[in-house]
Amino acid sequence: IRDRLSTKPEQILDTIHSRCQHVYFKPIDKGQFINHLVDESLTRPVAEMLSTYTTQAETALSLNEEYDLTSLRKTIIRWCELLLTNRSMALIGIIDLLKQAKNRKLQLLTLSAVNGFFEDIMHAKVEVNSEYIYSDLSVEIKKYAKHLTYNQLILMYDQLTEAHKKLNQNVNPTLVFEQIVIKGVR
């Protein structure tokens, strides 16, 4: 019998998964994680964005060293705003988005960050007093929350979940992001 540990149970084959013993650990508190990354010299906005993607400090720090995450974050925010205000421009904006998110890791980070943007809107909509992932955009987030219905937000969550699946199945990233625009918030 071999002992194996995995932090990605979704990548284990079903036949093996059924024979596994599952042990779940509570992930680090998001606020603590963000503060830890800030202490490690990341900017708060980048740390907040990375907290949507990982709870592993090493992963977050290496991504920050390898890539220009400040620029990626700005592009993601711009694209999210286009999704809500001008869908035809959001389709065109995919080109800029994928120029920044040029590999699978960054594309998954982008999807997680987009999900975080809509999570903030949902928190504002239900008036949950939690920390926003995009703390510097709280005014804009609340404005979007007033204009979106619960059904629109749920539809967007469904599209983002589907996009994650498709990206993990190696579907062309342009097609994945186009589907978010086409089938997302209307």
Regions from the language model: what does each represent?
Residues 1-7:
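Structural recognition of the conserved hydrophobic beta-strand(s) that form the central parallel beta-sheet
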